[in-house]
From Swiss-Prot:
Interacts with CO (via B-box) and with TPL (via PFVFL motif). Its main location: nucleus. This is B-box domain protein 30. The PFVFL motif is required for interaction with TPL. Changing H59A: In miP1a*; loss of interaction with CO, but no effect on interaction with TPL. The gene is MIP1A. Induction: Circadian-regulation. Peak of expression toward the end of the dark period in both long day and short day photoperiods. One of its GO terms (cellular component) is nucleus. Highly expressed in shoot apical meristems and in vascular tissues of leaves. Also detected in petioles. A motif (PFVFL) lies at residues 113-117. Changing C32A: In miP1a*; loss of interaction with CO, but no effect on interaction with TPL. Changing C35A: In miP1a*; loss of interaction with CO, but no effect on interaction with TPL. Pfam families: zf-B_box.
Length: 117
């Protein structure tokens, strides 16, 4: 997973200053599977990399397609970020899964956060 979202927020709050978002090398862009432009999202349900224009076209087709969760691709390292799109333009950031264990005398509680979509 990419740390791009947090770094992007820091960059935007820094008057739009230009800095590297990821420490990994810049890879070749992934192409949109419909038009060949640079892909910006990956739809797991369709198993397709799509540019923003094609993503809007494909996922506005019907109510089932609007439910698809699409992962945003980092512009620097080309990996999938935690930032997702649902529906037309609804942004969601997936939380990191962390396990917190609290051990008491005779029991332990395990808490794992999750997201309903």
């Amino acid at each position: 997973m990419c740390r791009g979202f947090e770094k992007e927020e820091e960059r935007r709050s820094d008057n739009g200053g230009c800095q590297r978002l990821c420490t990994e090398s810049h890879k070749a862009p992934v192409s949109c599977e419909l038009c060949g432009e640079n892909a910006t999202v990956y739809c797991e349900a369709d198993a397709a990399f799509l540019c923003r224009k094609c993503d809007r076209w494909v996922h506005s087709a019907n109510f089932l397609a609007r439910r698809h969760l699409r992962r945003v691709i980092c512009t620097t390292c080309r990996k999938l970020t935690r930032r997702c799109l649902v529906g037309d333009n609804f942004n969601v950031v997936l939380p990191e899964i962390r396990m917190i264990a609290r051990i008491e005398e005779h029991s332990s509680d395990h808490k794992i956060p999750f997201v309903f979509l």
